[in-house]
Amino acid sequence: MIQVLLVIICLAVFPYQVSSIILESGNINNYEVVYPQKVTALPKGAIQQLEQKYEDAMQYQFKVKGEPVVLHLEKNKDFFPEDYSETHYSPDDREITTNPPVEDHCYYYGHIQNDADSTASISACNGLKGYFTLRGVTYLIEPLKIPESEAHAIYKYENVEKEDEDPKKCEFRRAGTECRPARSECDVAEYCTGQSAECPTDVFHSNGKPCLNNFGYCYNGNCPIMYHQCYALFGPNATVGQDGCFEWNKKGESYFYCRKENDVPIPCAPEDIKCGRLFCELIKNTCKYDYSEDPDYGMVDHGTKCGDGKVCINRHCVDVTTAY
Protein backbone atom coordinates (compact mmCIF):
# COMPACT_ATOMS: atom_id res chain seq x y z
CA MET A 1 0.00 0.00 0.00
CA ILE A 2 2.86 2.36 0.87
CA GLN A 3 4.55 1.56 -2.46
CA VAL A 4 1.36 2.28 -4.39
CA LEU A 5 0.95 5.58 -2.53
CA LEU A 6 4.52 6.57 -3.36
CA VAL A 7 3.92 5.86 -7.04
CA ILE A 8 0.79 8.01 -7.00
CA ILE A 9 2.76 10.84 -5.37
CA CYS A 10 5.51 10.48 -7.98
CA LEU A 11 2.97 10.64 -10.78
CA ALA A 12 1.53 13.81 -9.34
CA VAL A 13 4.75 15.61 -8.44
CA PHE A 14 7.28 14.32 -11.00
CA PRO A 15 5.29 13.77 -14.21
CA TYR A 16 8.29 14.23 -16.49
CA GLN A 17 10.46 11.75 -14.65
CA VAL A 18 7.77 9.07 -14.71
CA SER A 19 7.72 8.91 -18.48
CA SER A 20 6.36 5.50 -19.48
CA ILE A 21 4.63 5.17 -22.81
CA ILE A 22 1.16 4.94 -21.31
CA LEU A 23 1.65 8.06 -19.22
CA GLU A 24 3.17 10.04 -22.09
CA SER A 25 0.27 9.15 -24.39
CA GLY A 26 -2.32 10.18 -21.82
CA ASN A 27 -4.68 7.57 -23.22
CA ILE A 28 -4.59 5.18 -20.26
CA ASN A 29 -5.80 6.22 -16.84
CA ASN A 30 -7.11 2.89 -15.57
CA TYR A 31 -4.04 0.81 -14.82
CA GLU A 32 -2.71 -1.16 -11.87
CA VAL A 33 0.78 -0.75 -10.42
CA VAL A 34 2.54 -4.03 -9.64
CA TYR A 35 6.03 -5.03 -8.51
CA PRO A 36 7.08 -8.28 -10.26
CA GLN A 37 9.31 -10.41 -8.07
CA LYS A 38 11.69 -12.75 -9.84
CA VAL A 39 11.62 -16.37 -8.68
CA THR A 40 14.38 -18.79 -9.62
CA ALA A 41 13.27 -21.03 -12.47
CA LEU A 42 16.42 -23.15 -12.71
CA PRO A 43 15.97 -26.87 -11.96
CA LYS A 44 17.46 -28.02 -8.69
CA GLY A 45 21.19 -28.53 -9.14
CA ALA A 46 21.35 -26.64 -12.45
CA ILE A 47 23.97 -23.93 -12.95
CA GLN A 48 23.40 -20.73 -14.90
CA GLN A 49 26.22 -20.02 -17.34
CA LEU A 50 28.14 -16.99 -16.14
CA GLU A 51 28.44 -15.41 -19.59
CA GLN A 52 24.70 -15.72 -20.19
CA LYS A 53 22.96 -12.44 -19.38
CA TYR A 54 19.40 -13.63 -19.96
CA GLU A 55 18.32 -16.96 -18.50
CA ASP A 56 16.67 -19.66 -20.61
CA ALA A 57 13.72 -19.75 -18.20
CA MET A 58 12.38 -17.27 -15.67
CA GLN A 59 9.42 -16.88 -13.33
CA TYR A 60 7.88 -13.71 -11.93
CA GLN A 61 5.28 -13.29 -9.21
CA PHE A 62 2.91 -10.33 -8.94
CA LYS A 63 -0.75 -9.61 -8.32
CA VAL A 64 -3.54 -8.83 -10.77
CA LYS A 65 -6.57 -7.28 -9.06
CA GLY A 66 -5.26 -8.58 -5.75
CA GLU A 67 -4.88 -12.15 -7.00
CA PRO A 68 -1.36 -13.64 -6.96
CA VAL A 69 -0.17 -14.93 -10.33
CA VAL A 70 3.03 -16.61 -11.46
CA LEU A 71 4.30 -15.80 -14.95
CA HIS A 72 6.40 -18.59 -16.47
CA LEU A 73 8.74 -17.48 -19.25
CA GLU A 74 10.98 -19.42 -21.63
CA LYS A 75 13.45 -17.86 -24.03
CA ASN A 76 12.09 -17.90 -27.58
CA LYS A 77 14.93 -19.82 -29.22
CA ASP A 78 13.24 -19.53 -32.61
CA PHE A 79 13.05 -15.75 -32.42
CA PHE A 80 16.10 -15.31 -34.67
CA PRO A 81 16.86 -17.59 -37.66
CA GLU A 82 20.20 -19.40 -37.81
CA ASP A 83 21.35 -17.14 -40.65
CA TYR A 84 20.33 -13.92 -38.89
CA SER A 85 22.30 -10.90 -40.07
CA GLU A 86 22.23 -7.14 -39.66
CA THR A 87 22.94 -4.71 -42.48
CA HIS A 88 23.71 -1.03 -42.15
CA TYR A 89 25.39 1.63 -44.23
CA SER A 90 28.54 3.57 -43.41
CA PRO A 91 28.80 7.36 -43.88
CA ASP A 92 30.37 6.73 -47.30
CA ASP A 93 27.37 4.55 -48.33
CA ARG A 94 29.19 1.22 -48.01
CA GLU A 95 26.93 -1.70 -47.12
CA ILE A 96 28.13 -3.49 -43.99
CA THR A 97 26.63 -6.86 -43.02
CA THR A 98 27.41 -8.64 -39.76
CA ASN A 99 26.24 -11.85 -38.09
CA PRO A 100 26.01 -10.94 -34.41
CA PRO A 101 25.51 -13.66 -31.79
CA VAL A 102 21.83 -13.75 -30.94
CA GLU A 103 21.58 -16.73 -28.59
CA ASP A 104 21.53 -14.53 -25.48
CA HIS A 105 18.58 -12.31 -26.40
CA CYS A 106 15.80 -11.09 -24.10
CA TYR A 107 12.59 -12.20 -25.85
CA TYR A 108 10.37 -14.75 -24.15
CA TYR A 109 7.08 -16.54 -24.51
CA GLY A 110 5.18 -18.23 -21.72
CA HIS A 111 2.02 -18.67 -19.71
CA ILE A 112 0.36 -18.03 -16.36
CA GLN A 113 0.59 -20.84 -13.82
CA ASN A 114 -2.67 -22.82 -13.37
CA ASP A 115 -4.27 -21.26 -16.47
CA ALA A 116 -3.97 -23.77 -19.32
CA ASP A 117 -5.35 -21.33 -21.90
CA SER A 118 -3.04 -18.45 -20.99
CA THR A 119 -0.28 -17.11 -23.23
CA ALA A 120 2.46 -14.51 -22.87
CA SER A 121 4.93 -12.67 -25.09
CA ILE A 122 7.42 -10.60 -23.11
CA SER A 123 10.55 -8.57 -23.72
CA ALA A 124 12.75 -8.64 -20.61
CA CYS A 125 15.44 -6.31 -21.97
CA ASN A 126 14.56 -3.44 -19.61
CA GLY A 127 11.90 -4.61 -17.22
CA LEU A 128 8.94 -6.65 -18.44
CA LYS A 129 7.18 -5.30 -21.51
CA GLY A 130 4.61 -7.12 -23.60
CA TYR A 131 1.35 -8.91 -23.02
CA PHE A 132 -0.19 -11.90 -21.27
CA THR A 133 -3.66 -13.42 -21.14
CA LEU A 134 -5.33 -14.42 -17.89
CA ARG A 135 -8.71 -16.18 -17.92
CA GLY A 136 -9.41 -14.98 -21.43
CA VAL A 137 -8.53 -11.33 -20.74
CA THR A 138 -5.54 -9.73 -22.49
CA TYR A 139 -3.33 -7.50 -20.34
CA LEU A 140 -0.43 -5.29 -21.38
CA ILE A 141 2.51 -4.78 -19.02
CA GLU A 142 5.33 -2.26 -19.15
CA PRO A 143 7.76 -0.72 -16.64
CA LEU A 144 7.05 2.64 -15.08
CA LYS A 145 10.25 4.61 -15.42
CA ILE A 146 10.66 5.50 -11.77
CA PRO A 147 14.32 5.57 -10.66
CA GLU A 148 15.35 2.63 -8.45
CA SER A 149 11.87 1.10 -8.57
CA GLU A 150 10.52 -2.17 -9.96
CA ALA A 151 7.09 -0.64 -10.53
CA HIS A 152 5.24 -1.82 -13.63
CA ALA A 153 1.88 -0.83 -15.07
CA ILE A 154 -0.67 -3.47 -16.02
CA TYR A 155 -3.79 -2.55 -17.98
CA LYS A 156 -6.35 -4.34 -20.08
CA TYR A 157 -5.87 -4.11 -23.82
CA GLU A 158 -9.50 -3.01 -24.17
CA ASN A 159 -8.65 0.07 -22.09
CA VAL A 160 -6.27 1.23 -24.82
CA GLU A 161 -9.32 1.96 -26.93
CA LYS A 162 -11.80 2.64 -24.11
CA GLU A 163 -10.14 5.28 -22.01
CA ASP A 164 -13.19 6.45 -20.12
CA GLU A 165 -16.26 4.22 -19.94
CA ASP A 166 -17.65 6.00 -16.89
CA PRO A 167 -18.46 9.59 -17.87
CA LYS A 168 -18.58 12.32 -15.28
CA LYS A 169 -21.97 13.35 -13.99
CA CYS A 170 -22.94 16.77 -15.26
CA GLU A 171 -24.90 17.64 -12.06
CA PHE A 172 -26.35 20.67 -13.85
CA ARG A 173 -22.91 22.04 -14.55
CA ARG A 174 -22.47 24.96 -16.88
CA ALA A 175 -23.31 24.20 -20.50
CA GLY A 176 -20.17 23.32 -22.45
CA THR A 177 -18.42 21.48 -19.58
CA GLU A 178 -16.80 18.32 -20.95
CA CYS A 179 -18.28 15.22 -19.31
CA ARG A 180 -16.96 12.45 -21.56
CA PRO A 181 -13.64 12.99 -23.37
CA ALA A 182 -12.99 11.53 -26.81
CA ARG A 183 -11.25 8.17 -26.39
CA SER A 184 -9.73 8.27 -29.87
CA GLU A 185 -9.67 10.45 -32.97
CA CYS A 186 -12.73 8.51 -34.13
CA ASP A 187 -14.71 9.45 -31.03
CA VAL A 188 -16.40 12.74 -30.17
CA ALA A 189 -16.25 14.42 -26.76
CA GLU A 190 -19.60 15.05 -25.06
CA TYR A 191 -20.44 18.23 -23.16
CA CYS A 192 -23.00 19.12 -20.54
CA THR A 193 -26.09 20.82 -21.93
CA GLY A 194 -26.91 22.75 -18.77
CA GLN A 195 -30.40 21.23 -18.96
CA SER A 196 -29.69 17.77 -17.52
CA ALA A 197 -27.57 16.09 -14.84
CA GLU A 198 -26.73 13.30 -17.29
CA CYS A 199 -23.95 13.33 -19.87
CA PRO A 200 -25.40 13.22 -23.41
CA THR A 201 -25.48 9.95 -25.35
CA ASP A 202 -22.07 8.75 -26.50
CA VAL A 203 -21.59 9.42 -30.21
CA PHE A 204 -18.62 9.08 -32.54
CA HIS A 205 -17.43 10.08 -35.98
CA SER A 206 -18.97 8.40 -38.99
CA ASN A 207 -17.69 4.95 -39.90
CA GLY A 208 -15.26 5.14 -42.80
CA LYS A 209 -13.60 8.41 -41.79
CA PRO A 210 -9.79 8.13 -42.34
CA CYS A 211 -7.78 7.90 -39.09
CA LEU A 212 -4.20 7.43 -37.86
CA ASN A 213 -2.74 9.25 -40.86
CA ASN A 214 -4.79 7.14 -43.29
CA PHE A 215 -3.53 3.85 -41.86
CA GLY A 216 -7.12 3.01 -40.99
CA TYR A 217 -10.76 4.02 -41.10
CA CYS A 218 -13.02 4.78 -38.17
CA TYR A 219 -15.30 1.96 -37.05
CA ASN A 220 -17.73 2.41 -34.16
CA GLY A 221 -15.56 5.02 -32.46
CA ASN A 222 -12.25 3.19 -32.84
CA CYS A 223 -9.53 3.04 -35.49
CA PRO A 224 -8.78 -0.67 -36.03
CA ILE A 225 -5.48 -1.38 -37.78
CA MET A 226 -3.60 -4.66 -38.14
CA TYR A 227 -0.50 -3.37 -36.35
CA HIS A 228 -2.42 -2.80 -33.11
CA GLN A 229 -4.01 -6.23 -33.42
CA CYS A 230 -0.60 -7.90 -33.83
CA TYR A 231 0.64 -5.96 -30.78
CA ALA A 232 -2.26 -7.33 -28.73
CA LEU A 233 -1.65 -10.92 -29.85
CA PHE A 234 2.15 -11.14 -29.76
CA GLY A 235 3.50 -8.14 -27.90
CA PRO A 236 5.52 -5.01 -28.72
CA ASN A 237 7.98 -6.71 -31.08
CA ALA A 238 5.30 -7.87 -33.50
CA THR A 239 4.45 -6.20 -36.78
CA VAL A 240 2.07 -7.06 -39.62
CA GLY A 241 2.98 -10.10 -41.72
CA GLN A 242 4.00 -9.76 -45.34
CA ASP A 243 1.40 -10.00 -48.10
CA GLY A 244 2.43 -13.55 -48.97
CA CYS A 245 1.35 -14.78 -45.53
CA PHE A 246 -2.25 -13.78 -46.17
CA GLU A 247 -2.32 -16.00 -49.28
CA TRP A 248 -2.75 -18.91 -46.85
CA ASN A 249 -6.30 -17.72 -46.22
CA LYS A 250 -7.22 -19.02 -49.67
CA LYS A 251 -6.69 -22.60 -48.44
CA GLY A 252 -10.00 -22.83 -46.59
CA GLU A 253 -8.65 -25.39 -44.12
CA SER A 254 -7.60 -25.68 -40.48
CA TYR A 255 -7.11 -22.07 -39.35
CA PHE A 256 -6.83 -20.41 -42.73
CA TYR A 257 -10.17 -19.16 -44.00
CA CYS A 258 -12.46 -16.15 -44.07
CA ARG A 259 -15.52 -17.61 -42.35
CA LYS A 260 -17.21 -20.86 -41.44
CA GLU A 261 -20.53 -22.26 -42.61
CA ASN A 262 -21.89 -25.19 -40.58
CA ASP A 263 -18.44 -25.40 -38.99
CA VAL A 264 -16.84 -25.85 -42.43
CA PRO A 265 -14.04 -23.34 -43.21
CA ILE A 266 -14.70 -21.30 -46.34
CA PRO A 267 -11.61 -20.09 -48.22
CA CYS A 268 -11.13 -16.39 -48.78
CA ALA A 269 -11.62 -15.04 -52.27
CA PRO A 270 -8.38 -13.48 -53.57
CA GLU A 271 -9.67 -9.97 -52.87
CA ASP A 272 -10.68 -10.91 -49.28
CA ILE A 273 -7.49 -12.56 -47.98
CA LYS A 274 -6.72 -9.67 -45.60
CA CYS A 275 -10.10 -10.09 -43.89
CA GLY A 276 -9.50 -13.66 -42.70
CA ARG A 277 -6.80 -14.97 -40.35
CA LEU A 278 -4.45 -12.22 -39.12
CA PHE A 279 -0.78 -12.82 -39.86
CA CYS A 280 1.98 -11.06 -37.96
CA GLU A 281 5.77 -11.10 -38.06
CA LEU A 282 8.10 -11.60 -35.09
CA ILE A 283 11.05 -12.95 -37.07
CA LYS A 284 11.85 -11.49 -40.48
CA ASN A 285 10.18 -13.28 -43.40
CA THR A 286 8.04 -15.54 -41.18
CA CYS A 287 4.27 -15.82 -40.80
CA LYS A 288 2.93 -15.85 -37.23
CA TYR A 289 -0.73 -16.45 -36.40
CA ASP A 290 -2.87 -17.37 -33.42
CA TYR A 291 -6.20 -19.10 -32.91
CA SER A 292 -8.60 -20.51 -30.32
CA GLU A 293 -12.08 -22.03 -30.09
CA ASP A 294 -13.47 -18.50 -30.34
CA PRO A 295 -14.22 -18.10 -34.07
CA ASP A 296 -13.22 -14.41 -34.02
CA TYR A 297 -9.98 -14.80 -32.05
CA GLY A 298 -6.93 -14.26 -34.22
CA MET A 299 -8.99 -13.02 -37.15
CA VAL A 300 -8.69 -9.55 -38.66
CA ASP A 301 -11.06 -7.21 -36.81
CA HIS A 302 -14.16 -5.90 -38.53
CA GLY A 303 -13.66 -2.42 -39.94
CA THR A 304 -9.93 -2.92 -40.49
CA LYS A 305 -8.36 -1.39 -43.59
CA CYS A 306 -7.64 -4.14 -46.14
CA GLY A 307 -6.52 -1.98 -49.07
CA ASP A 308 -6.65 1.56 -50.37
CA GLY A 309 -10.21 2.74 -49.86
CA LYS A 310 -11.31 -0.69 -48.61
CA VAL A 311 -12.34 -2.17 -45.24
CA CYS A 312 -13.21 -5.60 -43.85
CA ILE A 313 -16.95 -6.09 -43.39
CA ASN A 314 -18.34 -9.57 -42.72
CA ARG A 315 -15.00 -11.05 -43.86
CA HIS A 316 -15.19 -9.31 -47.22
CA CYS A 317 -12.86 -6.51 -48.35
CA VAL A 318 -15.28 -3.91 -49.67
CA ASP A 319 -15.20 -0.29 -50.80
CA VAL A 320 -15.34 2.01 -47.78
CA THR A 321 -17.80 4.32 -49.54
CA THR A 322 -20.42 1.56 -49.72
CA ALA A 323 -19.52 -0.40 -46.56
CA TYR A 324 -21.64 1.54 -44.08
Curated annotation (Swiss-Prot):
Residues at which Ca(2+) binds: 187, 190, 202-203
Domain Disintegrin: 168-207
Cellular component aspect of the GO annotation: extracellular region; plasma membrane
Tissues expressed in: Expressed by the venom gland (at protein level). Expressed by the venom gland.
Signal peptide: 1-20
Regulation of activity: Activity may be regulated by the intramolecular thiol-disulfide exchange or disulfide bond switching.
Activity dependence on pH, as recorded: Structurally relatively unstable in pure water, but more stable in various buffers between pH 5-9. Most stable in 20 mM HEPES buffer at pH 7 with the addition of 2 mM Ca(2+).
UniProt biotechnology annotation: Potentially useful in the development of antithrombotic drugs, particularly due to the possible control of its activity via the redox potential.
Disulphide-bridged cysteine pairs: 179-199, 186-218, 192-199, 211-223, 230-280, 245-287, 258-268, 275-312, 306-317
Motif (D/ECD-tripeptide): 185-187
Posttranslational mods: N-glycosylated. Exists in at least six differently N-glycosylated forms. The glycans likely have a stabilizing purpose.
Positions of the propeptide segment: 21-173
Region (Inhibits platelet aggregation): 179-192
Family stated for the protein in its record: Belongs to the venom metalloproteinase (M12B) family. P-III subfamily. P-IIIe sub-subfamily.
Task of the protein: Abolishes platelet aggregation induced by collagen, ADP (IC(50)=292 nM) and arachidonic-acid. The inhibition of collagen-induced platelet aggregation may be due to its ability to bind collagen and block the binding site on collagen for platelets and/or to its ability to bind to the platelet alpha-2/beta-1 collagen receptor (ITGA2/ITGB1) to block its interaction with collagen and hence prevent platelet stimulation.
Further comment: Arises from a gene lacking the catalytic metalloproteinase (MP) domain and the N-terminal part of the disintegrin-like (D) domain. The latter results in truncated D domain (D').
Subunit structure: Monomer. Is able to form a homodimer.
Protein name, per record: Disintegrin-like/cysteine-rich protein MPIII-3
